[in-house]
UniProtKB/Swiss-Prot annotation:
Record-stated family: Belongs to the glycosyltransferase 28 family. MurG subfamily.
Region (Disordered): 1-22
Keyword 4Fe-4S included in the entry's annotation: no
Protein name, entry field: UDP-N-acetylglucosamine--N-acetylmuramyl-(pentapeptide) pyrophosphoryl-undecaprenol N-acetylglucosamine transferase
Entry's Gene Ontology cellular component terms: plasma membrane
Any one GO BP annotation for this protein: carbohydrate metabolic process
Keywords: Cell cycle, Cell division, Cell inner membrane, Cell membrane, Cell shape, Cell wall biogenesis/degradation, Glycosyltransferase, Membrane, Peptidoglycan synthesis, Transferase
Membrane topology classification: Peripheral membrane protein
Domain of life from the UniProt record: Bacteria
Function: Cell wall formation. Catalyzes the transfer of a GlcNAc subunit on undecaprenyl-pyrophosphoryl-MurNAc-pentapeptide (lipid intermediate I) to form undecaprenyl-pyrophosphoryl-MurNAc-(pentapeptide)GlcNAc (lipid intermediate II).
Location relative to the cell: Cell inner membrane
Species of provenance: Polaromonas sp. (strain JS666 / ATCC BAA-500)
Length: 387
């Protein structure tokens, strides 16, 4: 999830090597070099950025390996990473699940091409350590990095390991996870997060003195969550106006017009936005958050210490969002509602029965569940392996 805007790093000159994507050349001499591999979704990219920024602060020269995108649509990482001042490398490879039989037929050729491109990148960048944070792009690059003798540090963000990390975990030098029990031999450290999530005041301090309508934050992510966009306005319309919360509803830019129409049709006032500038602050300000249960979202909410109603994305691979949410929900740190069980009447009833006292207790429970030193642990592993 996490579509918050981060500040860019120091500017660096740009060149375009033949046959490759734009690369920002870093001029520091003698620095240790890290190759960070992550792509596809914000759940992989934003933890990778947290690690990359921490490595840069420690004097490392950081290159990022991601995908180029397809069908005229650039990859998310190619849009997010270069503006933050990191050298960006790319190869041609993307997911295979749900793409049809032809994708599997041509997979061997695509893999060979991606293996060769990965070898070229690793030889050019000469990393002291390679850090993989998931996404299909990490498979060919991770395997070739190991083949070329480069130390590999792996981090799995979800409570159910993805296909790529299941394979790479067998050859990595260090394996970390955001949730417990993902791999038999791994270190549970939590998710790498920006410091802003960790530095928020504790829930008791934030809730002290709050009065009036509840503050409800609905988070749909970069693409929006159509089910939430349709259901929440209808649920609010069923509540007496005096009992309605103050609502901020974030949806992706592609769905913002439809979201405005939904609220207008329901006759409900709300602050509607295509993105959130400061997600950590928005989480801290909310009494209750309604959101999906991507790994970054769950761990960011826990780090802040916020109360959330999780509605897992029903098509998530291996239903990992449900497992992510249960990490908090089973300990009283949130609520879980499957999309198939959602109704406007049920949500309206829940909102009317919810008070700040219960939300504070939920937020306090969530806060106790999150480890907050994941970024430091990953950076320390990189420095140990690079010696």
């Amino acid at each position: 999830m996490s579509e918050h805007v981060r500040s860019a790093g120091p500017p660096q000159a740009s060149t375009a090597p033949s046959g490759g994507s734009a690369v920002h050349e870093v001029t520091s001499v003698g620095a240790r070099v890290a190759l960070v591999m992550a792509g596809g979704t914000g759940g992989h990219i934003f933890p990778g950025l947290a690690v990359a920024e921490a490595l840069r602060e420690r004097g490392w020269r950081v290159h990022w390996l991601g995908g180029r995108g397809n069908a005229g649509h650039p990859s998310m990482e190619s849009q997010l990473v270069p503006p933050r001042g990191f050298a960006f490398e790319s190869i041609d490879f993307s997911g295979v699940r749900g793409k049809g039989p032809l994708t599997l037929v041509f997979l061997p050729l695509r893999l060979l091409k991606a293996f060769w491109q990965s070898i070229q990148v690793v030889r050019r960048v000469k990393p002291d350590v390679v850090v993989g944070l998931g996404g299909y792009i990490a498979f060919p690059a991770g395997m070739m990095s190991v083949l070329l003798g480069k130390p590999l540090v792996l981090h799995e963000q979800n409570s159910v390991a993805g296909m790529v990390n299941k394979v790479l975990a067998g050859v990595a030098d260090r394996v970390f996870t955001a949730f417990p029990g993902v791999f038999r031999k791994a270190e549970w450290i939590g998710n790498p997060l920006r410091p802003a999530f960790i530095r928020q005041p504790d829930p008791a301090t934030r809730f002290a003195g709050r009065a009036g309508p509840l503050k409800l934050l609905v988070v749909g992510g970069s693409l929006g969550a159509k089910a939430l966009n349709e259901l929440v306005p209808r649920a609010l319309a069923l509540m007496p106006p005096a009992q309605r919360p103050d609502v901020t509803h974030q949806s992706g830019i592609r769905q913002i017009d439809e979201l405005r129409a939904n609220y207008a049709a329901a006759g409900v006032q709300a602050e509607l936005t295509p993105f959130i500038e400061d997600t950590a602050q928005a989480f801290a300000d909310a009494d209750l958050i309604i959101c999906r249960a991507g790994a970054s979202t769950v761990t960011e909410i826990a780090a802040v210490g916020a109360a959330a109603l999780f509605v897992p994305f029903p098509s998530a691979v291996d239903d990992h969002q449900t497992t992510n949410a249960r990490f908090l929900v089973d300990q009283g740190g949130g609520w879980l509602l499957q999309q198939r069980d959602m109704s406007a009447a049920a949500l309206a009833d829940m909102l009317q029965k919810t008070d700040r006292s219960a939300l504070l207790q939920c937020a306090l429970k969530a806060k106790t569940m999150q480890k907050t030193d994941a970024t430091t642990r990953v950076v320390a592993a990189c420095e140990e392996l690079a010696r």
